[in-house]
């Protein structure tokens, strides 16, 4: 009866072999090495009835052995019922756990056994840990109880035990330690259990076969053990159900957390992508900025080089402009110097021409005087009755007149040719000097000629001004003074006074100085009334007329009246003013005293106005040598009023021992 109950219980509860056979198709890892799923299923089918009986026999023999030898196994003296109950419960739990995978909870167990699972399965692992420990203890006691059972007689049971053990070991969850120490200890316990199981397997294989022949009584305390087993089974089912409920709750919580974590992960990934994109944008922007900076740097360098080149060009241009300005200045200076040279050359050329013309005029003037003298004599001789002596004198004077005219023409031709050569560019010093013509002595005059030309004291004309007051043309200082000095043409003419140029007011009037052209040669002269006047001398009357008043006395009276009217002027200033008035009017004839006084007053007022306007620096005079303005610092001090440069008078001052002025004999 007990055997039947055990068999019924064994048939009602799934055995480890059946559970392993059901789960063999799900996982191939729980099978032993060298067995395929088909082979294990076939063996389990063939060996299932004997396995139950062999298990029951083994249990009964183990129980009897423990009862008979309590001292030999003190560790297994807890009781056969407890050992058998634990073994059956462990096998049922293993089978139930293996069968859960076939009922659709394989994913849940995989999640529980996965060591890299979520953090929320800690409570499930803690609740399953004592169950797995109890399963390990039951399996260990079962191996110790069936140690005398040979592997040859119970091959299916050993295979199922090993499969259930392997499946139980594979299903053990890895509990992460709270502090890193407990996990290490649990792993060490698991390693020790697995090593003890392996050792027990090896010992079970190497056990003597004679122990399998022992007999065990299985009828003792069966019902009590079955009741306990059923109670434990119910409790385990309830605990298992609680564990499943907790697992579902934890799974739901884990799903929520997983969704939150996934959402957070997505957000983090999105943020990460955005950050990566921002980093990429910043990197691109940095590269672009770097390229832009390099480009700008190159542009700046190029611009700097261009600016340097432009600066060099500008500097070169500035230097060139300075050189051009200096060149222009030098050109202007050279042009000015050339102009000055041309002006000086032209001035010297004009001075040379003026010198030649002055000398020509002087020589021609002397020859014209001789010509007029000859004409005068011929005119008188023609008016006299012809006699042998007068004819001879007339011939001599005609010969002299022709010679003088020829000589005058030659002098003019020579001087004109020299003037033309000088105008063409020849130097005066390089031209041959024109000799001064020498007149032959005049023919001797007869006694009647001497009587005719003997002037009467009562008829001696007086000049309105003294001869010394008449100024001759000024000779340029550059001319040779020696070339301007002429010898006296005729000794007879030298005794007579030189004719002065007629005054502007005397044009058309009778010349009062014709009687002074010829000086008397004899002390006796006939009366002028007995000599008829020559026909060409109209205006000279030999009648006895009252003599004119002397012009000098009249000029003195005019000066005295003017000095009385203008006491601020002296005699020299008044004479100068009268000369200016005469130069401006070309004549003083026909002026009344009142008109003359008005002209003098106007001239004095003009002088005062000019003096007041040019009061600042004194007017510079012209140098008589170079005809340039003489500055006060360059003026050579002299006793006279002549102005000369120090450099111009330097050679004269060194060579002249008397240190006199070259234009006047006044000493310093």
Swiss-Prot record:
Phosphoserine found at: 15, 40, 48, 54, 196, 497, 511, 516
Compositional bias (Basic and acidic residues): 60-71
SUPFAM superfamilies given in the database record: RING/U-box
InterPro entries according to UniProt: TTC3/DZIP3-like_helical (IPR056872), TTC3/DZIP3/RBM44-like_helical (IPR056870), Znf_RING (IPR001841), Znf_RING/FYVE/PHD (IPR013083)
Gene3D superfamilies: Zinc/RING finger domain, C3HC4 (zinc finger) (3.30.40.10)
Protein name as it appears in the record: RING finger protein 214
Compositional bias segments (type: Pro residues): 523-536
Zinc fingers typed RING-type, residue spans: 623-665
Cross-referenced PROSITE patterns: ZF_RING_2 (PS50089)
PANTHER family associated with the record: RING FINGER PROTEIN 214
Region (Disordered) location: 1-87, 103-125, 486-552
Modification type N-acetylalanine: residues: 2
Composition bias, Polar residues: 43-59
This protein's record includes keyword Plastid: no
Gene Ontology molecular function terms on file: zinc ion binding
Coiled-coil ranges per UniProt: 220-379
Keywords associated with the record: Acetylation, Coiled coil, Metal-binding, Phosphoprotein, Zinc, Zinc-finger
């Amino acid at each position: 009866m007990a055997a039947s109950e055990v068999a019924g219980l064994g048939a009602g509860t799934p055995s480890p072999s059946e559970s392993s056979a059901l789960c063999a198709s799900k996982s191939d890892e729980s099978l032993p090495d060298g067995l395929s799923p088909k082979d294990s299923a076939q063996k389990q089918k063939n060996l299932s009835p004997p396995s139950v009986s062999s298990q029951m026999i083994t249990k009964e023999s183990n129980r009897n052995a423990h009862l008979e030898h309590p001292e030999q196994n003190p560790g297994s003296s807890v009781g056969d019922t407890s050992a058998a109950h634990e073994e059956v419960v462990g096998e049922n739990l293993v089978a139930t756990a293996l069968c859960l995978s076939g009922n659709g909870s394989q994913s849940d167990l995989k999640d529980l056994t996965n060591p890299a699972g979520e953090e929320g399965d800690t409570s499930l692992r803690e609740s399953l840990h004592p169950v797995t420990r109890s399963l390990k203890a039951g399996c260990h006691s079962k191996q110790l109880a069936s140690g005398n059972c040979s592997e040859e007689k119970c091959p299916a049971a050993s295979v199922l035990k090993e499969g259930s053990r392997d499946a139980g070991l594979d299903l053990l969850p890895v509990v992460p330690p709270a502090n890193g120490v407990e996990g290490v200890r649990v792993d060490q316990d698991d390693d020790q259990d697995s090593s003890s199981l392996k050792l027990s397997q090896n010992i079970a294989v190497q056990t003597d076969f004679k122990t399998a022949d022992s007999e065990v009584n299985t009828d003792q305390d069966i019902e009590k053990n079955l009741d306990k087993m059923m109670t434990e089974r119910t409790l385990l089912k309830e605990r298992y159900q609680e564990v499943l409920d907790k697992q579902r709750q934890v799974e739901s919580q884990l799903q929520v957390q997983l969704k939150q974590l996934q959402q957070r992960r997505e957000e983090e990934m999105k943020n990460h992508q955005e950050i990566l994109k921002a980093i990429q944008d910043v990197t691109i922007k940095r590269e672009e900025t770097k390229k832009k900076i390099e480009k700008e740097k190159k542009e700046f360098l190029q611009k700097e080089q261009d600016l340097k080149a432009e600066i060099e060009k500008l500097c070169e241009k500035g230097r060139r402009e300075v050189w051009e300005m200096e060149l222009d200045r030098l050109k202007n200076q050279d042009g000015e110097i050339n102009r000055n040279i041309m002006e000086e050359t032209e001035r010297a050329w004009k001075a040379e021409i003026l010198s030649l013309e002055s000398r020509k005029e002087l020589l021609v003037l002397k020859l014209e005087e001789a010509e007029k003298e000859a004409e005068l004599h011929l005119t008188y001789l023609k008016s006299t009755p012809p006699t042998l002596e007068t004819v001879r004198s007339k011939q001599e004077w005609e010969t002299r007149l022709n010679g003088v005219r020829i000589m005058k023409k030659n002098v003019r031709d020579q001087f004109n040719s020299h003037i033309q050569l000088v105008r063409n560019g020849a130097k005066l010093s390089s031209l041959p000097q024109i000799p001064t013509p020498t007149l032959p002595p005049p023919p001797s005059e007869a006694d009647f000629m001497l009587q005719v030309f003997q002037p009467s004291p009562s008829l001696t004309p007086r000049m309105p001004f003294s001869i010394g007051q008449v100024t001759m043309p000024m000779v340029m200082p550059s001319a040779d003074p020696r070339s301007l000095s002429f010898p006296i043409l005729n000794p007879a003419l030298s005794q007579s006074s030189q004719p002065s140029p007629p005054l502007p007011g005397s044009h058309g009037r009778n010349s009062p100085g014709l009687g002074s052209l010829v000086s008397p040669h004899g002390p006796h002269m006939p009366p002028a009334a007995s000599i008829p006047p020559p026909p060409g001398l109209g205006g000279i009357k030999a009648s006895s007329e009252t003599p004119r008043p002397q012009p000098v006395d009249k000029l003195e009276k005019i000066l005295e009246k003017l000095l009385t009217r203008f006491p601020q002027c002296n005699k020299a200033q008044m004479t100068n003013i009268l000369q200016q008035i005469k130069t401006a009017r070309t004549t003083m004839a026909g002026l009344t005293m009142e008109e003359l006084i008005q002209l003098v007053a106007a001239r004095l007022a003009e002088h005062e106005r000019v003096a007041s306007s040019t009061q600042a620096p004194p007017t510079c005079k012209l140098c008589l040598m170079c005809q340039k303005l003489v500055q006060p610092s360059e003026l050579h001090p002299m006793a006279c009023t002549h102005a000369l440069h120090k450099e111009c008078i330097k050679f004269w001052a060194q060579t002249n021992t008397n240190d006199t002025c070259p234009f006047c004999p006044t000493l310093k």
